[in-house]
Amino acid sequence: MRSMAQHLVTKIVTRRGLLMSKGMCPRMGRLCAVSIFCAFSGIQDASCVSEPAPPQDLERNHPGVAARYLQEGRWQEALSQAEQGVASAPQIADFLFIAARASYALQQPRARALQWMARAVAKDMQWCVYDIEEVRLFYARLCVDTLQHARALELLATAEQVSADADWLRARARYGLGQVEHAQELIEKALERWALDARFAKLFFAQERSRRPSSRSKKIADSILSRLSVWQEQDPSLLVEAALFEPRTNMAFRYLQTYFTLRPLDAPGESSAQSSYEQSTRAGDSAPEQELYARAQSIVLGLQYGVLDEQRAMEMFCTLNSPLAVPAVDPTDDVSSFGVHASSVSSSTPLQRVVVLYADLLHEFSRLLASRPIRARFARFLAEFEGVLYTDENRDGIVSARVFFKAGRPSRAQFDTNQDGILEYEVYANDGAPTCVHTMHSTQKTELSRASVFPIPQNIAAHDHERAAERWIAPRVSLPADNGVEGETQARVPLTQQGYRVCYDRYPEVHQVGWEDKTYVLRPRALRWQPVRMQSLDLARDLEGVRSHDFFTMVLTNEPLPTEQQITVSSLYYEKPDSLFERARVRTYLDEGLPLFSETHVGSRFRARTHYVDGRATRRDSDRDDDGFFETREYYNAQGAVRALSVDVHKDRSFAYQEEYGAKGQKVQKWYGRGRVTISHTELPTGHARTEWLHPVTGRHVTVDFVQGVPKRLLVDGEVHALTKDPRNAALYWVRRIPRNGDEVGQRIVESFRAATSPVVSEYFRTGGSVVRAVRSGGVVFAEELEPGKE
């Protein structure tokens, strides 16, 4: 019943023609869809159907509008609408699913789509439109694309419906896990069950191309070749793959001729660069990089079988290009996401048509060139190559490495080893020698939650996964921060985690490492780290007889990242921001990983210096007012907290003020004059405080006790004096009594002390024949009317 409701909702909400043909406005159609869904599903209080809400809230909180945009291929509008829906109705899973599919279609990083989906399949989420089988297939597709083949099989193991999509994903996952026989078995059955679907034939050709043929694989290849005409118009690139498996030269020649007829050389299928998820999953359509590879391979095979002459093949091979986002990136900046095709970049990102070569085709092409002049031209082309070299090691159509060239040498390399769209490594080079490496880490490893809409599969074979029950559940991940939604039970995992920024003196000798907010500068030759190595393609041997330089690329070495301890021990110093001053940076010098001293600069101005003993900060001198004199000194305890602070107020190299901090929270402030303490103020954690000073005129010892900031007792040379609070001035207290003209003299006292800056100030006031002596201590003023003759 629920499936029927979802089907009706989808038809009403996502098909504009049905709405308009009935004379119904889109808004009414959406409300009608909500009503039908409620009636069939029995949901009365679902959050996607708020009964008391006005029509505009129903429209905003129901995913119908976003679903319609998705159905019509309006990816950006669907994504924007879905993000708004997530913000207003975070419990509705359809918005998350639509956002994931739209971002995938826009060729944004797959890691983002995985995050959307991880939240969508949580147990507490509610579905309004989409069938769970469709959700399962898309999630499995994401897992296969990002090399999570085990998880994909676990998701598909509980599928309730039989479909070509599910079988295709299973076959891909089996190949990814190295289970070739199981994959061949699936393809063999699928060729009969889904006879019109070209994806299985294409998958078989791509994965079996470099394997030694078995009797079973030969049988499958013959079966595919015998029915090639069924699929050739759906996916002409299948003809190129077939030529590699065709034992008859004349038939291979015919396949290539047919391909060039369907895909003319002068129109290399640029429109395919805009293909989306929905198009690429149907038989006959290819993702942009798959289509580009088929074009490059057709040129090589065309030369091999005589369909193209050397001149024509050379021109086509050396001008094959693709629209790529190639922003001018500073090597010291953070790494951006993996460069992708034009449809995935914003309007502000510059696009360039970049010449593309494939590493596995270069050997074959250069070997086939027989003419000496053509070989010489190709050698010059490689020596001056300005473009990008693609690598797809697992032949799944997703590029895992891109190496950009300038003047025939690598200038930048990008590695996305798990194919989630977030770079693990980006390498910058000068004339082929690495100068800087950025490392980033994707969020494939996340905390797993067992709350999911998909039940735990009970019947997964042992050869599939030994720990399926522990690993199958999708991670519960919060949405990206810019979407404004984060549930209380969600584990917050950012899209990317910041890694290292490593720069070299001479590769692989590390000169500088940036990590979090720190920048480490290493001692010469103290640390070597070689994440990539130069690999020659040996093209000079293929181009024998002409002058050619060694054409090489970059490949990962899988050398582990250096640890923080290794970096620290190898460092001369490190720098980081200093919160003491605006735009300040502190440089800490190290000896075998332990701090010796540190200096703080604001631009070229030297503002502070910290001394260390056995790696522990003991003292810091600083110039707080930027006059060139270090007037402030801080002392630190064993835990690194400030235990005392002294200030040379008069800049005479004697400290006039000091603060001391006790282990139990007490604080003591002292002011000095002529080498002795003139004022002392002690605060206790209980709220009690005491101020003591020598009267600046009489020299008598004065003590004031405070409770919660209020003066409670005043002693002068041990004699207790009563205190009376002035009714008009909260900070004024009278000793013993308030004089008759207290209002007038009290106002004069407050105004007089308002401009004073000294901690303790004493003044005499004459008014109405009487004399008043007033003393300010901190923020409190004590006033006393003197007897005649005692002033």
Curated annotation (Swiss-Prot):
Polar residues: compositionally biased ranges: 271-283
Q: Where is this region: Disordered?
A: 267-288
Its protein name is: Uncharacterized protein TP_0374
